């Protein structure tokens, strides 16, 4: 999910660089999500060409895996059309991987997206199955509820969220899911958004049904109208929907703190079960 690249040129080059970070995690393989079927382009890899070990194509789902003999942290990827017929190239995303232990983190989504956006994406379920998650956090709903009170149907939101949960669990039935309640916000900068509380109700209902945890950002902020207080303290932007950089960092820190505490609680519960 996110932005798709579409091009009909005969020669396309994409450069990968760590320009704005001192941390440059290396990778030993890359997965390129693209058009389904036979890919009408040959791949070249610039200075990394000699390091290519093998290339594998999945025509059914639409991706290509490229494996390198050594770790690299930059790449010049070139697509050259291998047919006279003018066929376009569509790129849906890239995955950079290595064999190091730890967590592989993937973020999906774009500004303005709601649950309906993901459900309308015909490639989402297939691509998720190709790389099934072990842990999936749902942090979506602000745009779903960013409508007048009488135009928001909590049951439609609940059904859409449950459909998404089922897609994730179909990809990996053992996947752990974290549901999050959207943050407090204002509608058109001046109207209190009373839909968030209604979202929270159905999110908690699903959490109880599927035995999954919930992180209540709405409650954490102070509930209805609290985004005004966060804005006054430099934590939200003037639209009182999006956070500032400082606000997003605080939100991330609070999520990690809650997550670590939750893991500790689960560990204690497991130990008590063993004693019994």
Each PLM stretch: what is its role?
Residues 48-49:
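Intrinsically disordered, low-complexity regulatory regions of nuclear DNA-binding proteins
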Residues 133-145, 154-161, 169-170, 178-217:
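Conserved N-terminal glycine/acidic-rich loop preference
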Residues 121, 125, 158-165, 200, ...:
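Extracytoplasmic/secreted envelope proteins and their assembly/folding machinery
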Residues 1-45, 54-159, 242:
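Conserved SGNH/GDSL esterase-like catalytic core that processes O-acyl groups on lipids
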Residues 176-178, 244:
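Extracellular low-complexity Ser/Thr/Asn/Gly-rich intrinsically disordered segments
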Residues 183-276:
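Catalytic His-Asp segment of secreted/periplasmic serine-dependent ester chemistry enzymes
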Residues 168-173, 262-265:
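Secondary-structure transition/capping motifs at alpha-helix termini
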């Amino acid at each position: 999910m996110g932005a798709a690249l579409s091009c009909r040129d005969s020669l396309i080059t994409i450069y990968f660089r760590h320009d704005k970070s001192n941390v440059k995690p290396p990778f030993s393989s890359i997965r390129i999500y693209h058009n389904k079927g036979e890919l009408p382009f040959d791949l070249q890899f610039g200075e990394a060409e000699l390091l290519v070990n093998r290339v594998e194509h999945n025509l059914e789902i639409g991706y290509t895996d490229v494996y390198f003999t050594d770790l690299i942290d930059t790449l010049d990827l070139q697509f050259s059309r291998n047919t006279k017929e003018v066929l376009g190239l569509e790129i849906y995303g890239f995955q950079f991987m290595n064999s190091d232990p730890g967590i592989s983190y993937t973020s999906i989504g774009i500004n303005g997206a709601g649950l309906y956006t993901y459900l309308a994406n015909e490639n989402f379920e297939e691509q998720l199955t190709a790389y099934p998650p072990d842990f999936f956090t749902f942090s979506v709903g602000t745009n779903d509820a960013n409508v007048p009170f009488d135009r928001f149907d909590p049951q439609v939101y609940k059904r859409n969220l449950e459909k998404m949960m089922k897609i994730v669990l179909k990809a990996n039935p053992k996947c752990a899911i974290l549901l999050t309640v959207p943050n407090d916000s204002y509608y058109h900068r001046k109207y209190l958004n009373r839909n968030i509380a209604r979202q929270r109700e159905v999110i908690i209902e699903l959490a109880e049904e599927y035995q999954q945890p919930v992180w209540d950002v709405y409650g954490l902020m102070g509930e209805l109208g609290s985004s005004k207080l966060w804005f006054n303290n430099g934590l939200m932007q003037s639209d009182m929907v999006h956070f500032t950089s400082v606000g997003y960092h605080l939100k991330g820190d609070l999520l990690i703190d809650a997550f670590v505490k939750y893991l500790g609680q689960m560990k204690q519960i497991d130990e008590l079960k063993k004693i019994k």
